[in-house]
Amino acid sequence: MSLGGTRPLPRVLSLLAAVAALTVACGGGGVRIAFRPQPGTRYEYVVTVHSTVKTQLGDQPAQNDDEETVLRATHTVLRSQRAGLVRVRVQLRTPGGTTRTFVVDLDRAAQLDAIETIEGLPAQVFGNLGVSEIFPAAAGAPPTRVLHAGDTWRIDDHLRLPDQGPARFVGAGRLVELAVVRGRAVARVRSATRLPVARRTELRQGQVVLRGSQATESTTTQDVSDGAVEDASSLSHGVFDVSLLPPPGSKAPPVDGRMVLDVRSTVRRVG
């Protein structure tokens, strides 16, 4: 590699440092890539979500909705792993300036424990967001043990989700490769997960009950030094039974139906 005028010296030194870090990390034949940030650390992302929803209720014709949303996400680390949990505040902003805030908790093993909404408008304003869009590092979080390229692991997390309560997040992950991207030593992880959905939403006209499951395949590139996500992409497919329940006191019968949801998303670090 030439160190001539074709590339600024600081960039070359940064690249060499990343290669050295990757070499040290893999010196024993493996690497640890658990999410372990310092309190106060902030990460900025652009999140693009494209969703297609097909809904059929009662004897009505099926309705199709197609939507693409671009969000700006700010992740701020509130509590370090040394205190027991890693707690991260996730703020998602629409182009119009609307903000929804989540708090994400990870346990001592850096596995997802809970995602909670603490403020902001209802979920409908932000489209069909899932774990991969809110906090991509948790979509197939590796174990804290030393991993080698090609290693696999099981995902089996009991967690709390917004508007739902307890759920079991299951699947499998795989460390695809180790590389250097934009001067950072990174690990690429692929995962396939399934999340059950059992949600009841109160409306003025009654209640909406949603039951089913959502399967997601994702690829995540994480910084080896602290586990932060550099970029991610995911494909989700969900099939749900839908029930529209009348308000208390009404003699109207419930309306049952079915909803099929497909979501494609990308997450890119910009700061």
Per-region residue spans from a language model:
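Acidic, serine/threonine-rich low-complexity disordered tracts
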Residues: 26-108, 155-271
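Bacterial N-terminal signal peptides
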Residues: 13-25
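Short, surface-exposed secondary-structure edge patches
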Residues: 33-34, 142-145
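Short coil-to-beta transition motif at edge beta-strands of beta-rich domains
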Residues: 148-156
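Bacterial N-terminal signal peptides that target proteins for export
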Residues: 1-16
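Short acidic, low-complexity segments enriched in Ser/Thr/Gly/Pro
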Residues: 108-134
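Short, structured beta-strand/loop micro-motifs enriched in basic residues and often containing a Trp
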Residues: 26-28, 128-139
